[in-house]
Design a protein with these regions (language model features):
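Extracellular/luminal Protease-associated
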Residues: 1, 456-473
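Contiguous hydrophobic, helix-prone segments at protein termini
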Residues: 1-451, 455-456
């Protein structure tokens, strides 16, 4: 019997990275890319709230590698990742092969195992250059200007932040707060990101590390580069050394909080209070320093001793390169100090943005639920449009579910479901490849094998006692 069938067809919809109703983020769904959160996970160890991610969107304005449909920075389950597929594709367009690009990116984004294939963007060299070069040239020009302003920014930022936090507290109307955001906060916040980006561009470490490894071997190269602070301390070490000074009575509590109260393990997340906001934080930290057998300043001195020994060996073995390498080490050290100081002040500005969000929450009656709105949605609320507030309960629930999961793999290839991955008892914590091993961890090594190989965070099995830290604190 003949039958007539009606076949209905429709285009396959491209999955969206973000659902604004629920606050679910998953950029791994938008294409077959390789993502890494190395370095990112140190700066942002928490699942981000919508407010925090919208803050990072402002940073993206200072990044030249954005192509519609191919994000450079994405969010997977609330955590930020960098799209290595895009970076390697752009390197290929500039004539740099994939192996070289992998090597050059190791210091900043970590090592990608040789066994992992990095898919590239399906665009020709000409298309990539046409799409990216105009933005790259524009951003490069802006960064050259910013590099000349970094030191002035570092010098003036603390007073500006103190003034702005006080002004925010004195605002009593939505219209006034919107005006303050547009005239003062948003421009300076964008400038802070540009300063941080420009300081990062000044990083000369990668090439020097490669040259030192070739000349002196990995161990001595690490020793020579472990003392970049030299006689002048890196800003990233100041809070730790400062705690020791407070514990010994060499620094007042007030001075410590004024200088370092904006720094902490959660400084890039808007919803979490800064140390200076918690009256018990410093007491707890000082008590911990007194109990701890670890002395930060002694550890730094140990690094200096290791540096001196490695440098003497270098002088004996490579006398012709001593002067040039010494100059390069000095330049790298100066660059590192500038970069860390700029990052510290950018973190101080982020505290001001947190104060802005809290004030929005006060004026709108939202309290800390305000962090489940984006910065643009906060401005809408201040202007009388409260439509986004209906999404807050679902976004809060999504954030809670993401936060209950263990940290995701450092490297992700292809589509990744964080909940399915977390449910697998043999999941890998270093790598997820949807096209190969997926969530499954490798088998334990054969008996008698005592050497562990791999890279930081690599999967493997070894028996012993460890202290487990699920999150920074």
């Amino acid at each position: 019997m003949n039958r007539l069938y009606s076949l209905q067809s429709q285009p396959i919809a491209t999955p969206q990275a973000y659902d604004p109703l629920t606050g679910e983020w998953n950029h791994s769904l938008v294409g077959d890319f390789l993502w890494t959160n190395s370095n990112f996970c140190e700066a942002i160890g928490d699942v981000m709230t919508p407010a925090t991610w919208s803050m990072w969107a402002i940073y993206m304005e200072a990044v030249p590698f954005e192509i519609p449909g191919y994000p450079l920075i994405g969010v997977i389950g609330g955590r930020p990742y960098i799209n290595m597929s895009l970076l390697l594709s752009f390197g290929r367009a500039l004539g740099i092969d994939g192996r070289t690009m992998r090597k050059r990116s190791e210091d900043l984004w970590g090592r990608i195992p040789d066994s992992v294939d990095v898919p590239t963007i399906p665009l020709s060299r000409g298309q990539l250059l046409r799409l990216m070069l105009p933005t790259l040239l524009r951003v490069r020009k802006a960064l050259r200007v910013s590099k000349g302003e970094i030191r002035a920014f570092i010098a003036t930022c603390p007073r500006w932040c103190d003034t702005m936090r006080e002004r925010i507290r004195q605002v009593h109307s939505g219209a006034e707060l919107v005006e303050l955001w547009r005239r003062e906060l948003r421009p300076t916040f964008g400038r802070a990101w540009r300063m941080g980006r420009a300081a990062l561009e000044s990083n000369l470490l990668g090439r020097l590390r490669r040259d030192l490894v070739d000349l002196a071997g990995t161990a001595d190269a690490n020793a020579l580069l472990s003392n970049l602070s030299g006689s002048e301390q890196l800003a990233s070490l100041d809070p730790l050394v400062g705690l020791s000074k407070v514990a010994r009575g060499e620094m007042s509590r007030e001075a410590y909080l004024q200088q370092y109260g904006h720094r902490g393990a959660h400084e890039m997340e808007l919803s979490i209070p800064r140390p200076a906001e918690d009256p018990t934080w410093l007491d707890w930290q000082v008590a911990a320093v007194k109990r701890s057998p670890v002395d930060a300043e002694k550890l730094l001195e140990k690094q200096r001793v290791a540096f001196d020994a490695a440098w003497k060996r270098f002088e004996a073995q490579h006398s012709r390169q001593v002067r040039s390498v010494r100059l390069r080490l000095e330049r790298v050290a100066a660059s590192a100090r500038l970069r860390e100081a700029a990052r510290s002040e950018a973190a101080r500005v982020i505290w001001v943005i947190r104060e802005f969000a809290l004030r929005v929450g006060d004026l709108a009656g939202l309290g800390e639920d305000v962090f489940f709105l984006t910065l643009d949605e906060m401005l809408d609320v201040l202007s009388g449009d409260d439509a986004a507030q209906a999404c807050i309960p679902a976004r809060r629930e999504t954030h809670s579910r993401y936060s209950a999961l263990p940290p995701y793999p450092a490297i992700i290839r292809g589509r990744f479901d964080p909940f399915a991955w977390a449910a697998d008892p043999r999941r890998r914590s270093d790598l997820y490849d949807a096209h190969a091993s997926g969530t499954t961890a490798p088998a334990p090594p054969a008996c008698g094998v005592e050497t562990i190989t791999g890279f930081a965070g690599a999967a493997g099995s070894v028996e012993g006692l460890v202290r487990r830290l699920d999150r920074p604190r």
